[in-house]
């Protein structure tokens, strides 16, 4: 046995290449598996740790309740007290039940304020809510009519507030009650987004008691529990005590449970307040005694404690602390009850490495921190400032102490917002604070975007979601087609950011695991083949020795066991190196995924057991293969083994090949015989060579394919950066109105023969400048202050902004703030943007003109952030007026006291209105600025505002516009046109087979540098736009569309169109609204990214069924090209498909507000004849005022049109009409006008990312495959030549030189190249086509990679270079041969 083993070891010299190759393959297989498998396991362990410890939610619920207007009307118990109330300031009033009819009055919730939510509350809890919707108040001893009116107005506010508070806190009415019944665990999720010096910071509220999505720590200490609940209770207690009056303080404290409040006040007073502290201590002692405080000797002088609850004292619950301010004589005093835990934060691990680079560290001295937290507020602040800055983080000027590093499971993949879907830890920072910590910052950034919702763990997810959604249909105000509750993995819901945050990580782990398994199996299969090759080669080379051994009685089993060395040594060495390297490379692998992985991950440590396991596994597998192959060969009889061993045996294929070359010389026939002598090895080697050339061909052919494709795609764009897709008009909506963005809200000039569009302009005659601003930018004083929620069309065609709307206006018996309702109709992020823009606007005004701006704008310095907050000074912006014209308008409906001149009107001051118009004009001038200056403007940068004003004598577009059926366009889009924007076009929403496509109807633009539309080119670079305008129903498609749908020039395209102008008419009568169209393909554009379709504007407009006179003037449009994003970032345009703009958020049959509005619209439309309306309108115009009643007839007609009913409407069928609106308009009164924006730069970047990612994957794959295949080719070819060594010795003895001998041996490469080429070329063509198809299917990029002659030659040269290594190795081997010795040994 020893001799057998020695013989095997001696053969290592001749099989060293094979052994190295086998060791290398085992090393790669084990190393790859260990590395990737451990990475997957480590990732999965970290992810599971966070999700299990943090209790990841499985559902999200978005709350939206319709409390309605909460408007109360008076039902008088006193015949003498029927005066029309006027607007008065909000003040505290004690509501009491009346003792007599003459001293009381009753307020009842108006019918159109009784939303379905309130009606549900009345059904569920009538005892509670009947007393809240009908409330009796007392005038007390007041007899003055003006004072009574003020009491009535204040009482309305109190009644509304009481009802609102009850509705918002009643769990039985809210979804939280449903969740409790379902035994779900849940919590409220709150986050605020803040941009701080170019860094996007997100603060998330988190409590240690959270049961869902709780904070999981990796380092440091947990956040302390906040005192927010306690603060809310203290605030409520103080309000109750103060409302009952300081004179009743003794009785109030005795009868109520206010010990918590008194103790909290006492705990936060300094020792200097000895008298006050003594009074509080006495109060605490007496609260449980039978005597009142007034009866005790110690409390007879009770002035100090009473001062705290005086009507002039204030108690605020802001910024995470309670602040009590009161007066003692002329001295103003202050007490702060604060929560020191509001200064704590935990940093997300994804940001922590970056923070550490900036020198930040976790504060570890928790005992010192706990001591500081026990100090009074002022001392705490001083001690807090002494802590080193390296332990703190800043949000603006607000400091937090870094206590730890941690994450909640919903932010494992930290997607920050809809626009920030790719995490960037340097510029996007995530911090956790408790509830008071959250309030501490949120109170200083009230206008910033926030995320809110309920996150829950539902026991039976699908069932519970159905239950909640069915409940929400009846109790929430979402449109019927939107779900309030959905799974956290529901990627179809665009609002579900949690899906983007949690679904990605499991997908990433599964992908890595799949790649690991595939790669390991592939490499192991190659290793098995190499093992077989080595064994077969060894056994054949040592046939004689094996035969002699068997003849001498050595068993085949022993011989076979000796062969195990061939698998044992490579297996052990390869496994050891592979396992060691795989373990050591874990951090490298984790870092490779650093763009996707943001939580700390522990790596697996080196394990002797792990090493032994992998070594044993590989050895067993390779040994099994070795034993099996050896058994197959060694089972032959000894005679057969020794027979003809010394002869060169030519295979049948070799003999047949020799016969084909019978007429050639002997050496030629000899070389042919050599080439075909080992058919199976030749076949395998040929396949490997073909595979090598195929992969090389693919690599070379696709090398620049992406760059070429991107170049072609970029050529289709000409100058524009953005493509906006808008809502498509209907007959009910009318055409979209457009304006220059900077002039949005102004009256623009139109030609006299222009078709009247959907906009109507409202006159404001009282201010001269308003003649230029009629659409209107500033509210029409009376119109929006009277019955604004009772008009079905109250928002129609009005351009608004917060600066022109945010005023509480009074007229007659109505007080309203138009902005409040407009804000509720905006998406939350746009409402926040509007509030932010409002601050920037006021700041800009102050910056460019401090004197004039200071007249109307108040600046308040935030003590925490040291930032200025700006607001309009209402005392200077508004005026009270008793105008004769207003009284005349009211006479027909006003009460007798109103006719006596008791009516007050609160309106904008004329000088202030002129001041606003001046600012709008400055913005209008700013619209003429260079687009570069506009697009790159930092609205919060004071110096940039100054520079802009100095350069253009104008303001940038700082005012955020809210428009209805109106869209602001950049000047380059309009291009000096009057009736239609030059670079506006029509998009047909079409269906081709089962695919949704977009066909763009473009105009015949002049194709020069000012053109913003596409320049369509063929592969020969011929511009073919004009073909659209010279042939009927012509369409140009791009190369991608031609490939995907197998189309060509001359083919026809049959589609269905879904956005026709008359589509609603069809839906109203339950007909199919789709239109059919047939196009003739007149050209193929060379763009290769995603299918594109272009037709002429006229063809598109005709197919969409717009009137011919509109088409001739090119008035309709639903898309446009631009170089500016401002129409989206600095404005909100809402579109109503129905043409209706009611003051409610949904069309639904159970929407009480909607049905009331429909009733009033029908009743108003029937009672106002056309003559009466004209008379009222003429009177209103003459007086410079506008009364909403003149809208009634128009509103009635628009409602008829929206419903598709030409006969008279019946107010008793309001519910039926609401059902029609819900069905036809999908439950949505309005939607965003802008439905899609295509960013050329973003598309190019996406294209580049896809290209780079694909190329990297391709390079990595080829980088692994090519070396392995070439190693096999080298191994097999070397083995083949080694087997011919005996022949080489004989040829050398016959006098042949080494080069001639080698050339003879290299003849085996001839069929390899010939057959390799024959196989590789067609398969390469197929592979390249398959590669193109895969990229096209997955990324919608059409690559035109093809196989050409230079590519084939280059691949052959590379393969020849690899095979030349064999030539060199054998040259060296032949030079070492000593003929006499070799003949003797043989």
From Swiss-Prot:
Gene Ontology MF term list: transmembrane transporter activity
Q: Which InterPro entries match?
A: ABC3_permease_C (IPR003838), Macrolide_Exporter_MacB (IPR050250)
UniProtKB keywords: Cell membrane, Membrane, Transmembrane, Transmembrane helix, Transport
State the compartments where it is located: Cell membrane
Residue stretches in coiled coil: none
How is this protein situated with respect to the membrane? Multi-pass membrane protein
Chief place where the protein resides:
membrane
GO cellular component, as recorded: plasma membrane
Cystine connections: none
- Which segments cross the bilayer? 17-37, 402-422, 494-514, 518-538, 563-583, 592-612, 613-633, 682-702, 1261-1281, 1310-1330, 1349-1369
Protein family (similarity comment): Belongs to the ABC-4 integral membrane protein family.
Protein name per Swiss-Prot or TrEMBL: Uncharacterized ABC transporter permease MG064 homolog
Source organism (scientific name): Mycoplasma pneumoniae (strain ATCC 29342 / M129 / Subtype 1)
Lineage here is: Bacteria, Bacillati, Mycoplasmatota, Mycoplasmoidales, Mycoplasmoidaceae
